[in-house]
Amino acid sequence: MPGKTRYDDTLAVILSELSRTWARGKDQSTPEGWQYPDDHFNYTSVILTGGNTAPNRQIGGFDLDPAVKGQAVAILDESGTVVKRVPTAADLVATVCGAFGMKMGTDFFIPGGHGQIQDAITM
């Protein structure tokens, strides 16, 4: 449904990657000794505004303990089940695609699993 202003029809996404993790392993003298972690989006903040975003909401949170990977939120996964887990970058992309009216598994596919973050987008 079209909004009343251009702002209502425009989704702005501000994404900040705040750190990276280093490759680690027991013996890094050979390629087999390396373990490559997911070195992007270790800590990320995201702001969604305009479009179909739900107003005045903070979803998730943070912890100053570097061992904490984020706070679990409700996510509608690919199977249609609502699960509670820490969101990933793929979940953010799926949520943005959902705001554009795209359907998971039909209009787009993200390898490795993803879900739409609940309560971020109003429809």
What are these regions, as identified by a protein language model?
Residues 1-123:
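Feature marks hydrolase-like catalytic cores characterized by long aromatic- and Gly/Pro-rich stretches
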